[in-house]
Amino acid sequence: SKRTGPVQTNNLQVNSLGIYKNSVFGTTTAHFVTQLELVNTNPTIGTNITIDPVKDSVYLYIPYFSHLDEDATDGNTYILDSIYGNKESTLNLKIYRNGYVLRDLSPNPDPTDVSSYNQKYYNNEKGLVESNKVNIQLNDNSNTAENTAFKFSKEQYVKYKTNENGEWLDSNGAVTTDTEKRIVDEEFKPGMWINLNKQYFKENILEAAQSNLINNNNFKEYFRGLYFQIEENSGQDGVLAMLDFSKGKIHIQYHSDITVTTSVGTTTTNDKRELELNLKGNTINFYEYENDAIYQNYQTQLDNANEITGDKQLFLKGGEGSVVYIDLFGTDDTQSVNAEGTALIAGSNDIPDELDELRIKGWSINQANLVFNIDN
């Protein structure tokens, strides 16, 4: 087994968030940062902007991987997929505005390597974002399930139809306080549902200079995204989820005045309005490894790997972990194959001699098996 060293973790399709505790590899904490994009650029937001604490909302929604429970009778009970650890464990989730520029292109590319022009970020570069975050926690709701006692819930979220005043409506469009008569506006599969700081988004999105909202290049330079920071809660087993953050969105519902001038005259209306942001653009997944006794023992095993005769135990770990090398044909390379491909001759050719011999004899391998036993 050999260490991988830091690994590139930007712009992955699926990312990790949470804490995972393993009896062999120790504790891994996964954080995440992403850019945001306006769904509709250069929006008409209006004037006299308000976000009413009751009537309006600013929320973040990111769906989890899930499937319907076929054994349930209600038809809308879900089972979460890609969740590791104790699903009932809580985490201390903090969401901040990112202040670090997530570049598309590397400032120092190698002209001989086309791939070097794309910016690469690695799992151990959390400090870049941590030291540049805007130190105002955005998920500051009084509901601790959205911050200090966050957990990956399998519950659906249901949004009900409301009027301009945020009151529920029944099937006739009349105001109702009866929870049985209210009408469903939208159903959301299980996901991260976080109410964000309304005042902050009013001041920094709705009241931003129009030049910052005119296109997504300007917007991503102005508002550099969200940083999801994870902290462990004492006494918890830990839980980690795989998420497709690109399916997430921020929904801002507010009220404002918009003035329209026609040939008939000028009218100003104050109405409920909406603005949406997608969690799209550049991303980085950060991993931290707790330097405890378990982790140190794992590192010692890697330090003492025997590259000559091999090891009885092999350690395979993703992220900044370890890989396993299997040497099938030995390291001897004192011979090569003649021009006709019929005999071995003196001189190395960067191919193991045993493999050269198999090739010149034309032997075929019909079946080969490698059997690994996993230690519990």
Feature-to-residue mapping (PLM):
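Secreted, disulfide-rich extracellular signaling modules
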Residues: 1-376
